Swiss-Prot record:
<keyword id="KW-0963">Cytoplasm</keyword>
<comment type="function">
    <text>Plays a regulatory role in gas vesicle synthesis, required to activate transcription of the c-gvpA operon. Gas vesicles are hollow, gas filled proteinaceous nanostructures found in several microbial planktonic microorganisms. They allow positioning of halobacteria at the optimal depth for growth in the poorly aerated, shallow brine pools of their habitat.</text>
</comment>
<dbReference type="InterPro" id="IPR005149">
    <property type="entry name" value="Tscrpt_reg_PadR_N"/>
</dbReference>
<feature type="binding site">
    <location>
        <begin position="143"/>
        <end position="148"/>
    </location>
    <ligand>
        <name>DNA</name>
    </ligand>
</feature>
<comment type="function">
    <text>Expression of 2 c-vac DNA fragments containing 2 divergently transcribed regions (gvpE-gvpF-gvpG-gvpH-gvpI-gvpJ-gvpK-gvpL-gvpM and gvpA-gvpC-gvpN-gvpO) allows H.volcanii to produce gas vesicles. All site-directed mutagenesis is tested in H.volcanii.</text>
</comment>
<dbReference type="GO" id="GO:0003677">
    <property type="term" value="F:DNA binding"/>
</dbReference>
<feature type="region of interest" description="Leucine-zipper">
    <location>
        <begin position="153"/>
        <end position="184"/>
    </location>
</feature>
<keyword id="KW-0010">Activator</keyword>
<keyword id="KW-0805">Transcription regulation</keyword>
<protein>
    <recommendedName>
        <fullName>Transcriptional activator GvpE2</fullName>
    </recommendedName>
</protein>
<keyword id="KW-0804">Transcription</keyword>
<dbReference type="InterPro" id="IPR036390">
    <property type="entry name" value="WH_DNA-bd_sf"/>
</dbReference>
<dbReference type="InterPro" id="IPR036388">
    <property type="entry name" value="WH-like_DNA-bd_sf"/>
</dbReference>
<keyword id="KW-0238">DNA-binding</keyword>
<dbReference type="GO" id="GO:0005737">
    <property type="term" value="C:cytoplasm"/>
</dbReference>
<dbReference type="Pfam" id="PF03551">
    <property type="entry name" value="PadR"/>
</dbReference>
<dbReference type="InterPro" id="IPR011991">
    <property type="entry name" value="ArsR-like_HTH"/>
</dbReference>
Length: 193
């Protein structure tokens, strides 16, 4: 893998890409898996509802796409209020990665990925709204409902749009904060005597 990274870096240098880029194996695996998911969305859902559904715990072995992120301290540092604010996007990503999930699995996934305790009273209305909006399909089984992505491209575009807005906001806020720090250090407040 190191040879591939070195080859990629040298190709970037030869192409005149002027950037200090660092690669890590989990980042590349996640990016490659995401690219494969976006290119081949046919496996994300099926047209026929399943006849039998078995709970599958979210593990690194079962879902290599999220392996680098499971039990990650940075993700566990995200506040429950932020998770609740963006629960639609979180649910769409988790259901897309899984290819389908029931509510119990999604609650466990959110807890495992983010350390957040989202209540069923918060999550289930959002699943219904996503289904009503045509982003999810819901199959009713004997003891549970299974949610699948109805239109993978629409789901990806929705999440991508929200993520872009969040990144733009975060970069803008961080830039303003950096300017404030620079201005304060350049113009110290007079001390009271």
């Amino acid at each position: 893998m190191d040879d591939l990274l070195a080859e990629l870096k040298s190709e970037m240098d030869a192409a005149g890409v002027d950037a200090d880029v660092e690669f890590s194996l989990p980042t590349l695996e996640l990016t490659a898996a995401l690219d494969a998911t976006i290119d081949d969305t046919s496996q994300l859902y099926t047209d026929d509802p399943p006849h039998h559904y078995t709970d599958t715990p979210l593990t690194g072995d079962d879902l290599p796409l999220l392996e680098a992120w499971l039990d990650d301290a940075q993700l566990h540092g995200v506040g429950d209020d932020i998770i609740a604010e963006y629960i639609d996007e979180v649910l769409l990503v988790l259901i897309t990665v899984r290819g389908g999930a029931c509510g119990k699995e999604l609650l466990q996934d959110v807890r495992r990925l983010f350390g957040a305790d989202v209540s069923p009273g918060t999550m289930y209305p959002h699943l219904k709204q996503l289904a009503d909006a045509g982003l999810l399909e819901m199959s009713e089984l004997t003891k549970r409902k299974v949610y699948r992505v109805a239109d993978a491209q629409a789901a990806i575009e929705h999440v991508d749009s929200v993520v872009l807005q969040l990144l733009t906001f975060a970069v803008g806020l961080q830039t303003i904060m950096a300017d404030c720090i620079v201005n304060q250090s350049a113009d110290p407040q007079p001390q009271d005597e």
